[in-house]
Amino acid sequence: ELNSISNIKGLKKLKNLRFTFGSENSTSGRLMPEYFLNQAGVEIKHFKGKKAGFSGSHDATIALVNSGAFDAGALNKQVWENNLKNNPKRTSNLELFWITPEYVDYHWVAQGDLENRFGEGFTKELKSVILNLDIKQKSHKQILDMFNAKRFIKAESKQYKNIEEIGRKLNKIR
């Protein structure tokens, strides 16, 4: 049973099952799940039919596994939690069986000309506002809830290095 997977080695239970990733280029729907599967000794060739599916989106992964088209799939944790909360019928026949270790994922970017357009210090102020959102304040909580987040943290380019290395190992980045 998949619901008893307690560590990465347990992912071997996915061998010979019909498995789908989300989008082929998704960090949380393909890249990181495939990396951890590989770490457990599971490669795409080990799935039923010696291939994996690609649903195209996290919501589609839920729908395809729920319909029985696939036995299991990988998707973004926030999408899963959002469906549990807001659309429980979609997930009522499904079970979460494993969560990848944490990694830096989404990031915020701004156009380089914001200082010219909105004045000196604008980018610094924008960054400060985003990083100081406080879930205890109702208006801030509404914003954070849209991202299913408790807060945002400062990240640096070097924190994405492992994702880049994984992308190269899986031939998704050349």
Task: Please tell me what each predicted stretch does.
Residues 46, 88-130, 144-162, 166:
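Periplasmic-binding protein-like
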Residues 18-27, 51-52, 66-70, 112-116, ...:
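Second-shell loop/turn segments in exported
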Residues 44-63, 102-104:
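Short helix-initiation/N-cap motifs at beta->coil->alpha
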Residues 164-174:
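Tryptophan-rich aromatic "cage" segments
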Residues 38-39, 64-67, 71-92:
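A ligand-binding cleft/hinge motif common to bilobed small-molecule-binding domains
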